UniProtKB/Swiss-Prot annotation:
Endpoints of the signal sequence: none
Name of the protein described by the UniProt record: L-lactate oxidase
Keywords from the named record: Flavoprotein, FMN, Oxidoreductase
Protein purpose: Catalyzes the oxidation of (S)-lactate (L-lactate) to pyruvate, with a reduction of O2 to H2O2. To a lesser extent is also able to use glycolate as substrate.
Length: 365
C-alpha cells in the first residue's frame, strides 16, 4: 500500500501510528521493521521495562512556566526527543529520510542520519535543520570510514554517533516467515561509491561468527583512530555494560547512547531502560547519556529522564509514522510525543526537565 501523506482518522496518541502501520506497509516490510532477532525477547523486554514503572502525580504544583527546553551537545533544543538512526527508510515511504529530515526540522528535533540510509547524507542534510548528527558504521577499509567522516563534516553534521553493537545481526524470524527480501530500490546510498568486500568465508572448521562476521568488528584501536580523525564530538551508541560506559567515557567519548539496537542484535539482551540507572551511576551526574529502545509515548520519555537519561531517541515509531503519513506523520508523531510529555510533567508537578527525578516514579507492581 502507498502512504496517504495525510493524518488518518483514529490517531489519538503517538503509539497509534504503530497500530496503523500494517495497513500502510506490505507484510514483509512491516515484519522487517517491527521484528528483532531470534524470538523478539529483547523487543518485548524494552516495552515491558517501561510498564514496570508508574509516574507519581503531585498536587498543587505551579507549573504555569513549564517547558521542555534543554541544551544538548551545544544545541538548544525545544524538547528531549530525537529521531534515532534507522536504515532503509524507503521501505516505509518513497521520500525516505528526506521526509523524516523535514519533520525533524519542522518540530525542532535533532535528526540522527544513518550510514545505511536510502538517501545520501548530503541530501538529508539539505532537507534538515541545523540539529543533525550522523551515525557511523565503521567500514572494513579505514579510508572509506574517513571519507564518510569528511562528508559528514562538510555537510554540517554536528556530531558523529558511532554504533558498536551491530557487528552481528541475526535474521528476524518474523521477516523470514513473511518472505522478506530487501527491495532493489532500498540501497545504502552513502556506500554506493565504496567497493564492498565479499562476505568473509571461514575456512573449514572455523566459525562463521568468530572468523567470519566478527573479522571486521570495531576494536579499541579503531575507536582511538576515529577520535583522532574528526573535529566533531563522537557519541557511542549501543552501550549496556557499566564498565564499557566508564571506559568509553575515559577514552574521550562525548556522550553515550544506552541501547540494545532495538532488540536486533542480541535476543536476550537486557532492556535499555533496565540498564540506564546503572550506567548513570557509572558515568556520574552531568555526563551526557541518551536512551533508545521501546519509546512509544511521552510517558516513556518521562520515565527514561527520571531514571537518568538526558534525552531519548525514537526509532521504530518514526518509521511507522513515515509509512502512514509521510513527513506530516513523523512531525505529527513528534508533536504528540511532546504534548504527552508536557501532560505527564504537569501531572507529576515538574515544570522543567531538571525536576524529573527518580522519586517521580514508583514501581508499578
Amino acid at each position: 500500500m502507498s502512504p496517504s501523506d495525510r493524518i488518518p482518522p483514529g490517531v489519538w496518541n503517538a503509539i497509534d501510528y504503530e497500530r496503523l502501520a500494517p495497513q500502510a506497509m506490505d507484510a514483509g516490510r512491516h515484519a522487517y521493521v517491527a521484528g528483532g532477532c531470534g524470538w523478539d525477547a529483547t523487543v518485548a523486554a524494552n516495552r515491558a521495562a517501561f510498564a514496570g514503572w508508574a509516574v507519581l502525580p503531585r498536587l498543587l504544583r505551579d507549573v504555569r512556566a513549564g517547558h521542555t527546553r534543554l541544551q544538548l551537545a551545544g544545541m538548544d533544543l525545544p524538547h528531549p526527543l530525537l529521531l534515532a538512526p534507522v536504515a532503509h527508510q524507503r521501505l516505509a515511504h518513497p521520500d525516505a529520510e528526506i521526509a523524516t529530515a523535514r519533520a525533524a526540522q519542522a518540530t525542532g528535533s535533532c535528526l540522527v542520519a544513518s550510514t545505511l540510509s536510502s538517501c545520501t547524507l548530503e541530501d538529508i542534510a539539505a532537507a534538515s535543520g541545523p540539529a543533525r548528527w550522523f551515525q557511523l558504521y565503521l567500514q572494513p577499509e579505514r579510508e572509506h570510514s574517513l571519507d564518510l567522516l569528511r562528508r559528514a563534516e562538510a555537510a554540517g553534521y554536528r556530531a558523529i554517533v558511532l554504533t558498536l553493537d551491530a557487528s552481528i545481526q541475526l535474521a528476524s524470524r518474523g521477516a523470514l516467515q513473511a518472505g522478506f527480501a530487501m527491495p532493489a530500490d532500498c540501497v545504502s546510498a552513502n556506500l554506493a561509491r565504496y567497493p564492498q568486500p565479499a562476505p568473509a568465508q571461514p575456512a573449514a572448521g572455523e566459525s562463521r561468527i568468530f572468523q567470519g562476521a566478527m573479522r571486521h568488528a570495531p576494536r579499541w584501536d579503531d575507536l582511538r583512530w576515529l577520535l583522532a580523525s574528526t573535529r566533531l564530538p563522537v557519541w557511542i551508541k549501543g552501550v549496556l555494560h557499566p564498565e564499557d560506559a566508564r571506559e568509553l567515557q575515559a577514552a574521550g567519548a562525548a556522550g553515550l547512547i544506552v541501547s540494545n539496537h532495538g532488540g536486533r542484535s542480541l535476543d536476550g539482551a537486557p532492556a535499555s531502560l533496565r540498564m540506564l540507572p546503572a550506567l548513570r551511576t557509572a558515568v556520574g551526574a552531568g555526563y551526557p547519556l541518551l536512551l533508545d529502545g521501546g519509546v512509544r509515548s511521552g510517558q516513556d520519555a518521562f520515565k527514561a529522564l527520571a531514571l537518568g537519561a538526558d534525552a531519548v531517541l525514537v526509532g521504530r515509531l518514526q518509521v511507522y509514522a513515515l509509512a502512514v503519513a509521510g513527513a506530516l506523520g513523523v512531525a505529527h508523531m513528534l508533536q504528540m510525543l511532546v504534548e504527552e510529555l508536557h501532560a505527564c510533567m504537569a501531572q507529576a508537578g515538574c515544570a522543567r526537565l531538571s525536576d524529573i527525578t527518580h522519586d517521580t516514579l514508583t514501581p508499578s507492581c
